[in-house]
Amino acid sequence: MADTAKVALFVRLEAKPGKEADVEQFLRGGLALVQQEPATSLWFGLRLSATTFGIFDTFPNEAGRQAHLSGEVAKALMAKAPDLFAQPPSIEKAEILAAKLPGSANKAA
């Protein structure tokens, strides 16, 4: 597998009633901040249902993941959490076992 995707985060976000558009706007705006993080390989803001959103991102190593967790998007997420979310964001760490990335064939880690 490419060295750009060894570990990941999946963040589940449940919007408060009436805050769905604000959560969507927050995720769209977060892209500009993440683009300034050299160790964040891939980043996706997701809508899973009418009120459930998510973030999936990948990193080349644990140091990159920790840098992201200490970065501007994470700070903004936690600052806005009480206003936007029905419950605290659920942040799950994952190890990437296999991936198909642009410009590469399927490979196991």
Residue ranges and their predicted role:
Residues 10, 27-28, 56:
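Residue-level detection of beta-strand scaffold positions
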Residues 1-7, 42-52, 77-109:
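Glycine-rich beta-strand-turn "strand-cap" elements at beta-sheet edges
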Residues 16-18, 48, 60-62:
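Short coil/turn motifs at secondary-structure junctions
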Residues 11, 23, 43:
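GIY-YIG nuclease signature motif recognition
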Residues 14-24:
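Short, surface-exposed ligand-recognition loops at beta-strand->loop->(often short) alpha-helix junctions
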Residues 6-14:
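Active-site-flanking beta-strand signature of metal-NTP-handling nucleotidyl enzymes
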Residues 2, 29-42, 58-93:
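An amphipathic, aromatic/His-enriched active-site/gating alpha helix that lines ligand/cofactor pockets
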